[in-house]
């Protein structure tokens, strides 16, 4: 690396946390941060998958640890951050990534009509995607205000900026809400040296569905997305690594309150 690259994108020694890190986009986030020298805590509710993912990175000599956490449980989230502050003196970068695209049993091919929304499904999706993000951001802000610096990045979606086919109502509502939550928090936390941003991915392989992961969307879903994306394909989780490194590094020192779209150009057709 050149000195300019080192100065702009150096995250070596940064104390990072990624929620929903056991698989998919969250794992890609944790991986790139660890590959670039950050000390990364992978947090997830799925214990076996988290252990396997953490060991996969640790076996490569990367500086990672794991923490079981349900982001919808505010006490568990606060305990996670308290433990991290006690163990490593603070937290520099937090990626609030944990989320649900839908509840178990939801079939994207069937869609969802407004009059058939189940309250329990609505509460579950918003409990993770909105309230869980708030819990994570709030605990991160508490730690970062004490140290006078930090970066919080939320995984939103381009479904928070436009209506997407085959997405459930709770997903649309929660992702739109977290984008505005990011903007409001960025305004308040800026005087404390804390940057707050959102990433809005389009269709990626490895999308979370009901707490599980589908690496292979149905052919119908794949064809639909390919027609809506100017680049003509869905993305691999590795293609999110660039924006992750940017927002975690000194290169983004004057970027806050923004929603960064990574969707192959699909939003420009909205």
Spans of model-derived segments:
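Substrate-binding pocket helix/loop in short-chain dehydrogenase/reductase
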Residues: 105-114, 118-123, 221, 225
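Alpha-helical segment proximal to the catalytic Tyr-Lys
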Residues: 142, 187-188, 253
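Short, small/polar-rich loop/turn modules that mediate ligand/substrate recognition or access, typified
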Residues: 190, 195, 200, 255-257
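Short, flexible catalytic-loop segment of classical short-chain dehydrogenase/reductase
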Residues: 196, 200-212
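Short C-terminal tail/terminal secondary-structure segment
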Residues: 2-10, 245, 256-270
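Residue(s) in the substrate-gating loop at a strand-loop-helix junction
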Residues: 157
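Active-site helix of classical SDR
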Residues: 137, 174, 182
């Amino acid at each position: 690396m050149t000195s300019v690259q080192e100065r702009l994108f150096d995250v070596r020694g940064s104390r990072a946390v990624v929620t929903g890190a056991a698989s998919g986009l969250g794992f890609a986030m944790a991986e790139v941060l660890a590959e670039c020298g950050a000390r990364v805590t992978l947090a997830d509710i799925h214990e076996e998958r988290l252990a396997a993912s953490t060991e996969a990175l640790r076996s490569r000599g990367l500086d990672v640890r794991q923490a079981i956490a349900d982001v919808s449980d505010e006490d568990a989230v606060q305990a996670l951050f308290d433990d991290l502050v006690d163990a490593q003196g603070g937290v520099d970068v937090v990626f609030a990534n944990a989320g649900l695209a839908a509840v178990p049993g939801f079939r994207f091919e069937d869609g969802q009509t407004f009059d058939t929304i189940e309250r329990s499904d609505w509460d579950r999706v918003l409990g993770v995607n909105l309230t869980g993000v708030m819990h994570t951001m709030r605990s991160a802000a508490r730690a970062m205000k004490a140290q006078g610096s930090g970066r919080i990045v939320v995984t939103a979606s381009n479904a928070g900026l436009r209506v997407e086919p085959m997405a459930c109502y709770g997903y649309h509502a929660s992702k739109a809400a977290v984008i505005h939550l990011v903007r409001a928090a960025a305004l308040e936390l800026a005087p404390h040296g804390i940057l707050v941003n959102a990433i809005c991915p389009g269709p990626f392989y490895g999308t979370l569905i009901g707490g599980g992961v589908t690496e292979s969307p149905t052919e119908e879903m794949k064809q639909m997305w390919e027609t809506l994306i100017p680049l003509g394909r869905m993305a691999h989780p590795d293609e999110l690594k660039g924006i992750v490194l940017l927002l975690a590094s000194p290169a983004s020192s004057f970027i806050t309150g923004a929603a960064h779209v990574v969707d192959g150009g699909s939003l420009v057709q909205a």
